[in-house]
């Protein structure tokens, strides 16, 4: 085991603040089941080789994935870097091993787990140096040929994303004063959230940082092209076994056409150890 130093970037501060908000916590507390067919397909593909073996669930939020992962193995540990989220998950699952921990600095020995998962595009919520630390740490704690299943936002979908100002907030308001007031307040709050992260927004073509309409533009995230994501995994010591679109359609890793899907689910395998790797 080793400890790594990392600083909190502006993106970190914005996102961690969002994850402490009561409204966000309530949404995560009630989430359950598979998000979509693509998520289920990716996890089930990896699960075939790791049932009963140790599982690490990163970024568990309010605990949505806990029953899903424990159906694969009782040797389970869930982590999240948000103490508020961990408190929610522990209330829901008091007998489960759930810890406050940052994926950039995993407090586990080398080769501890057979499977690591990171759902909800959580890997996109840290900056690029942090993202590479996560991949290195996940690889370190995985066993030989261990699997890493995660979802990541797709650069090719950004043209279809809602942007602030999002006038859709007035769609159901009609002419009712109360609804109009709430819609206006939401629009203005979204504008404040958007401006808070505006200095971090960028677009380098294959990689971009943008605000998400989720939680009223309170979150910033990285968007990456499929080819860039695959290259990043290869350079981090993983082989890409499968990619799934949200609807469950499988995308060939060796010919990754940039479709318009908002995100993809990846199944990556830890490659054979090389000098300098665990």
Question: Over which residues does each language-model region extend?
Answer:
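A short acidic, Gly/Pro-enriched loop at the edge of an enzyme's catalytic core
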Residues: 104-116
């Amino acid at each position: 085991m080793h400890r790594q130093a990392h600083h909190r970037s502006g993106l970190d501060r914005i996102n961690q603040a969002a994850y402490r908000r009561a409204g966000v916590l309530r949404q995560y507390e009630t989430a359950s089941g598979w998000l979509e067919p693509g998520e289920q397909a990716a996890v089930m593909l990896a699960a075939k080789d790791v049932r009963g073996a140790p599982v690490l669930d990163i970024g568990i939020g309010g605990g949505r994935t806990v029953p899903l992962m424990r159906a694969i193995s009782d040797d389970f540990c869930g982590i999240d870097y948000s103490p508020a989220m961990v408190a929610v998950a522990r209330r829901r699952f008091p007998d489960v091993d759930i810890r406050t921990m940052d994926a950039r600095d995993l407090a586990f020995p080398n080769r501890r787990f057979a499977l690591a998962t990171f759902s909800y595009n959580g890997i996109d919520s840290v900056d690029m140096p942090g993202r590479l630390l996560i991949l290195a740490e996940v690889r370190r704690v995985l066993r030989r040929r261990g699997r890493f299943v995660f979802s990541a936002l797709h650069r090719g979908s950004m043209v279809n994303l809602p942007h602030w100002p999002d006038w859709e907030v007035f769609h159901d308001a009609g002419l009712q004063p109360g609804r109009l007031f709430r819609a206006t307040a939401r629009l203005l709050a979204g504008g404040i959230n958007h401006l808070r992260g505006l200095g971090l927004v960028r677009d380098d073509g294959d990689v971009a940082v943008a605000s998400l309409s989720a939680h009223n533009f309170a979150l910033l995230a990285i968007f990456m092209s499929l080819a860039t994501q695959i290259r990043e995994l290869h350079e981090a010591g993983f082989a890409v076994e499968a990619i799934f679109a949200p609807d469950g359609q499988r995308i060939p890793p060796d010919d990754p056409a940039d479709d318009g899907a908002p995100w993809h689910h990846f199944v990556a395998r830890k490659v054979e150890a090389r000098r300098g790797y665990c």
